[in-house]
Amino acid sequence: MNFKAERINIALAGGIIGIISVALVLMGNPANMGFCLACFIRDTAGGLGLHRAEAVQYIRPEIIGLILGAMGLSMARGEFSPRGGSSPVTRFFLGFFVMIGCLMFLGCPFRMVLRLAGGDLNDVVGLVGFVAGIIVGVFFLKRGYSLRRTYKQGQGEGIILPLAQIALLILVVAAPAFIFFTAEGPGAKHAAIIISLAGGLIVGALAQYTRLCMVGGFRDMILFREPKLLIGFCMIFVTALIGNLALGKFNLGFVEQPVAHNDALWNFLGMLLAGFGCCLLGGCPLRQMVMAGEGNTDSAITYLGLLVGAAFCHNFGLAASGKGPTPNGKVAVIIGLIVLFIIAAVNTFSKKESAGTERS
């Protein structure tokens, strides 16, 4: 694929994903939440009973479809390649703290774009924080930060998470008594299962084909002046904006925004944490889910970190709400930033010391 065609494909994929995101809201998803990896993983954690926040309990078919769509296309293209072993424990905790940052802001990088397309100006502060977090991450990348190489693994390792998603799909369709469903709140707002699943499958396939990644877009722009990946997310914004304007769902302002708060400092710090953590991971939650579908077990571990992080956020009062951040959540974000700085510094500068010792 030549360079120009690659950019065109990314733009087309972004445009389609933006349209799907608006369509899912029209079909029942919460406003400005046609797609949100953090929110949907949080809802799934609630649906499984990992937390008991009654307003956000529903196994989201979009996540299931996203992973299965990425797996299906990667297999069709001969790109399904089980691999892992690259600092899995570190990745788990990075995913954990990324979720804390996202639930302080009330959205992942994907939803950040959709919130902006819906007129939520609080998102501008979040975007600045997100980019600042990536810049901090790039500082360490330039100095040698790395989570080591991955190793080839058996086919069985690569299909465990996709098989788990099929099990979740069976549960949400069968609706047994031990699975939780929100009666009122964001978790109760959703498109029909088949529509949500189809949306996820398409987004997963498109993201796998184009390597869409919000973090990768800004990172590559900062490091290499390469805007390719950003084109996709710009197109998501443009098509979602046009869709919201056409459907009368555009609401410009800071207040009375759906599933959002207007505390600028903590919107900034939440996305600073998310951007920093995603940069250290090597990709945003969307990219992590796609790589998990491709057989990457490190990304599957990151998914588990996100899932456990979501459960912790609601079990211990860390998640923000439309009323604003909680005291516990503020402490958790600060702790998360400290932990990430420690992980990045130890990883980066201990390598330099060991390299210097070897040379001497």
Predicted regions located by residue number:
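Membrane-interfacial helix-loop segments of redox and metal-homeostasis proteins
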Residues: 1-360
